[in-house]
Amino acid sequence: AIYLNPIFMSTANHRYHTYDYWHVDPILGENPIFFLLLNEAHSRGMHIVLDGVFNHASRGFFQFNHILDNGEKSPYLDWFHVYGFPMNAYQGKPNYSCWWNLPALPQFNTDNPQVRKFLFEVAKHWIEQGADGWRLDVPFEIKDESFWRQFRAATKLTNPDAYLVGEIPSEAQDWLQGDMFD
């Protein structure tokens, strides 16, 4: 398989700061070029595994920006863990959960069913488009393992052969029982 680092629209050159999960970053050729890559790889018997960053998004992510613009009135308020207003997204200590305390990387509230639905839809969409699996970034940062069980169920329902692997920097036995990762 060919493993691709994050390919979605991002504010960072490595694309771990995703702001649009539905489009391949133009610097990488946009969606049509990705589909061409998928077709060419598949025609040669190769598989494509995408890097899924589902613990956090970019500060440029629409739902996060909606909170910045609308505060407590935003319907997306519960998509993230926000601890006060006004939000300190650019100056001072952030008053929301962010990965490694980096203000540019707000952490999703993956306990929120709407967030789960969104992320599972993203995962299913790209499998439906022909991706063969996911390499999942920092899955251990999402503390509720039911998230990954549901993620697996949604992905495998779309393609039972989809490959799921997580970035686990420690003993991975618990993750490899057939209900989260392959």
Region annotations inferred by a language model:
Residues L38, H42-R44, H56, F61-E72, ...:
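Active-site-proximal helices and loops of the catalytic beta/alpha 8
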Residues Y3, V49, R135-D137:
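Conserved beta-strand positions in the central sheet of alpha/beta enzyme cores
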Residues A1-L36, M46, E145, F151:
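Aromatic-lined carbohydrate-binding/catalytic grooves of carbohydrate-active enzymes
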Residues H17-N31, N101-R116, D132-I142:
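The substrate-binding groove and active-site-proximal loops of carbohydrate-active enzymes
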Residues N13-D25, F54-G92, A153, W175-D182:
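Aromatic- and acidic-residue-enriched segments that line the glycan-binding/catalytic groove
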Residues G92-W99:
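Catalytic pocket of metal/acid-base enzymes, prominently hydrolases
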